[in-house]
Amino acid sequence: MNAWDISFSSLSVGYGDHAVLHDINATLPGGKVSVILGGSGCGKSTLLRHIIGLSRPISGNLRIGGQDLFSLPHAEARRIRRRMGVLFQDGALLGALTLVQNVCLPLSEHLRLPKDVLREAGLRVLRMVGLEDFADYFPNQLSGGMRKRAGLARALIAEPRILLCDEPTSGLDPITAARMDALLQAMHRQYPEMTIVVVSHDLASLCCIADHVLVLREGRAIFSGTLPELEASRDPYLLQFLRREGGDEESLADAPADPRVSAALDKWFRT
């Protein structure tokens, strides 16, 4: 078992006594790219929020590397979740802060680092997603696609072992969406040990990097397996997700991590 496997066992999640997810049994393998698919309202984002810790299970459990997060002492569960980076669907940048200040928030809120070290850490991840030249812009000066890429940079700044992306191409035009997909592909190449989970309604542009696919329908898991297994399915509902579209290849700019930031993060992860 990989230390960063994400497993659901008879998991039901909801609000109050109303279940949105019903009896989910699946494992998203560590160090791989998993895509959670399904139509609107099927529970994809609810499942992602549950991994982050924004909801408690009605029944069943969630395990990371075999550890049931909701049975662990709070401090231990928090240490595991600190290794998660999240790209939320809305991006949620603070309008009063510049782009680099927004990206640095996961560090500046928890680590005592000199301002120049923080800024360089922010510039490093902005460089990775092609936004270094816009570091001192404010969010209202950026396009929707640029804000999404900034959200990705912010998710990467704390050197996560698990990256969770909620509809990363939602609301983007086809060209910008293809570039975001290409960035995810580039990230998988550069960080092959990172567990990446992408919530989407379309597998098309992620086929080349999807190691595992989980399909939800009306709050239930109807498929969990590899892409070849999905391709071998005769279920029309499953096969609709295999429409392929071409996309340009993207690469991440070379941006080695600052050892001062890595050392501070390592200390924080252990507290």
Describe each region flagged by the PLM.
Residues P174-T176:
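Helix N-cap at the start of a conserved alpha-helix in ABC-type nucleotide-binding domains
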Residues A178-P192:
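Helical segment within the ABC ATPase nucleotide-binding domain
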